[in-house]
Amino acid sequence: MKLAIKLAYRNLIGAGLRTWLNVIVLSFSFVVIIWMKGIMVGWDHQAKTDMKNWEIGGGQYWQENYDPFDPFTLSESHAAIPVSLNDEITNGEIVPSLIVSGTIYPQGRMQSVAIVGMNPHQSIFMLPTEKLDTTTSAIPAIIGSVSSRNLKLNVGDYVTIRWRNVNGMFDATEVVITGIFSCNVPSVDVGKIYIPLEKLREMMSLKGEATILTFREEQSERPEITGWSYKNTATLTQSVDELIQTKTVGQSIFYAILLLLAMLAIFDTQVLSIFRRQKEIGTYIALGYTRREVVGLFTVEGAMHSILAAIVSAIYGLPFLIWMAKSGWTMPIEASEFGMAMAQTLYPVYSAGLVISTVLIIVLVTTVVSYWPSRKIAKMNPTEALRGKLQ
């Protein structure tokens, strides 16, 4: 085996430009596949982290009628907070929020919004709710940067909001924008306006009630509470998992095409090599090599393309991958337009398992492709091969 590796290496280096063209193409596959997989892993990690910091915390209780995709359920999506959770709420380990449907009138225009009541002193979310603890002539409110852009509102602007209370009566008041935040989770930003929780309860005549109860830390088990539905972080981030899985399948097709082109070059090189080196093959057999050993020699020779490609890709790919991990890949279009948790700049994450699995898969595929044309050697007549007769 050691001799076969030495011979294979000598033959590859002796082939000159043909070898290095194959190696460069294959090394490009290494770098691109690892980078694109790293982008997907980084997006998954970043999206879930942002959702935990801005929206879901360590899990939630939803009022049983609440459906985030059906605004018509908001009028019934409220209930008294369970007494068993009062201690955790007092300690800041659970943050209650009340969500009601409303209408906002910026510059005389009308737009539907979800009015969210939030405790100004909460510390679970990264929302700047401390800006709700402000003394003003109107109700203090904060909105996201996308909502600010859509509604054409800035800090200090006054705007009218209208809502329908629990008794079915419509009412309206003015709010003043005391803060604008920027986040990567559209469901926290788009179509929502945040005001103090107690003020919203007073407006709606819903004292002590909430729509969502968010925990600071995730626990393996939470008690079942009548009228409330428990949602762990796995359930709340399921949409991200499904999206990443769909994107991964699409990327796999691209990986297959990229590998197919590289493997086609390897296959053609092997076929040409066997065709041109029939005398050499006959000489190996005459010197005592078995057909199996000669097939193994050519297979190792083809497989070594992937080893050399891994070395070459490490030379120029490692600095590129490190640079991308630090500076990130900025999306060419506004990420908020996708309607999902996605940062404008994605930072790839390269795990040891990702790199090792990619290298092993490419080496294995290259070995199989190299062996495929090498099987022809087993059918050759060594005498005819020594004479140089084409077979």
Regions found by a protein language model. Name each.
Residues 31-61, 321-328:
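Alpha-helical transmembrane segments
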Residues 1-34, 44, 53, 388-391:
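N-terminal Sec/SRP start-transfer signal
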Residues 16-41, 245-282, 303-316, 361-368:
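Hydrophobic alpha-helical transmembrane segments of multi-pass inner-membrane transport and secretion
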Residues 49-101, 114:
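Membrane-proximal extracellular/periplasmic loop immediately following the first transmembrane helix
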